[in-house]
């Protein structure tokens, strides 16, 4: 069985995908490395929003919560419930990871739908949601893969690898490829949906009066939120699956 070469080729393919370019890009040279400036700018903006929100959320909490405090507590409770549902009773240590993934993707997606990035002129290319770039989605999917391997090894030790021959050793190649293709599916699903949503809005705005694309933009906001939920749910489900050892 050529299991190892297949797995290596899958990882190599994932690395090659991170170099895929859609449209023009504006680059910065940092320490001898060429990086996508658009992705860094919009990602830093999203991170600033999240950090600012976190500072506001933990500053001066009230015994009788304000509307803002109620909102942040609801978001935290939602993420905790999501993690507990997918991972089980040992969900606690994974809440920060799942929450970070969900919130970063959610705010990134909505920033692409709500913020007028395109009015900011760049020498090449244009600004868009961070998740509109395959490099970002791959960068989000790879830590998810590391997380579920880490969760399984921490819970079961080397016995974790026994799942690859369940229910029969004949399925060994398929079970191995399944784990190594999970980041591929996560990356392409998020990237494809966000890119398609932004392209549809751009085309409609260029073809019809400005009022007509508004319903499509609201639909884009809805699907953007759903994509963040799907990514976080699948990430938590993969972690829970690796700890329980079932498929």
Swiss-Prot record:
Entry-linked InterPro entries: ATP_syn_F0_a_bact/chloroplast, ATP_synth_F0_asu, ATP_synth_F0_asu_AS, F0_ATP_A_sf
Primary localization class, coarse: plastid
Protein's membrane topology: Multi-pass membrane protein
Annotated localization: Plastid, Chloroplast thylakoid membrane
GO cellular component, one term: plasma membrane
Molecular-function GO terms, alphabetical: proton-transporting ATP synthase activity, rotational mechanism
Family per record: Belongs to the ATPase A chain family.
Role, per record: Key component of the proton channel; it plays a direct role in the translocation of protons across the membrane.
Quaternary structure and partners: F-type ATPases have 2 components, CF(1) - the catalytic core - and CF(0) - the membrane proton channel. CF(1) has five subunits: alpha(3), beta(3), gamma(1), delta(1), epsilon(1). CF(0) has four main subunits: a, b, b' and c.
Protein name: ATP synthase subunit a, chloroplastic
Phylogenetic lineage: Eukaryota, Viridiplantae, Streptophyta, Embryophyta, Tracheophyta
